[in-house]
Amino acid sequence: MSDITIIAIALAAVLMFVFPLMTMSDRTDDVAQLTVETATTEFVDTARSTGKITKANYDKFIETITSTGNTYNVDMEVQVKDDNLGKKVSQATADKIGENVYYSVYTSQIEEALNGKNAAYFCKEGDIVSASVKNTNQTISQQLKNFFYTVTGNDSYTIAAEHAGVVTANGK
């Protein structure tokens, strides 16, 4: 065989096997991205509308995102509205008395409440609930891109979602 034939066979092998593999792995990442975005939005919206984060909802959320076959770092934050009623203003309406200050409660504190006797973290109207999810493992798509292109590093993530909103109901 001539050199051109060997090159043609090698190129055909790449086009027939590697390119479809890369395309399918990218498609898998797209499906995982959509799943994570949907689950994150549903989790935060449920917490916003009910005013509480329950262990059952949190476990369902974690189960849904891990069903994609990846590992994730989930960060939750609740910015608790702290009404400062000690500082008065001249208007006598309930909405304008004092200043509102927010303090943050993070993932570890929320998980402690979920594992406690109530199995829930209760919010009140006006609190802000947010969740952020990022994959911690390298997907097949990332590995192939690293092999062929050397584009991404080991610390990068391709699947991520964030959602936040204001709580509209008291949890207790």
Pin down the residues of each PLM region.
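Low-complexity, flexible helical/coil segments
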Residues: 1-3, 75-77, 165-172
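Serine/threonine-rich low-complexity intrinsically disordered regions
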Residues: 2-3, 90, 106, 139
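Alpha-helical assembly-interface signal, strongest on the long, hydrophobic N-terminal helix that forms
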Residues: 2-63
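Residues in flexible loops and secondary-structure boundaries
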Residues: 5, 9, 82-84, 139
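A sequence-composition feature that detects small, non-aromatic residues
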Residues: 8-13, 32, 39, 47, ...
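Short amphipathic secondary-structure patches
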Residues: 46-122
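Extracytoplasmic
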Residues: 124-128
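Glycine-rich, aromatic-bearing surface loops/beta-hairpins
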Residues: 129-172
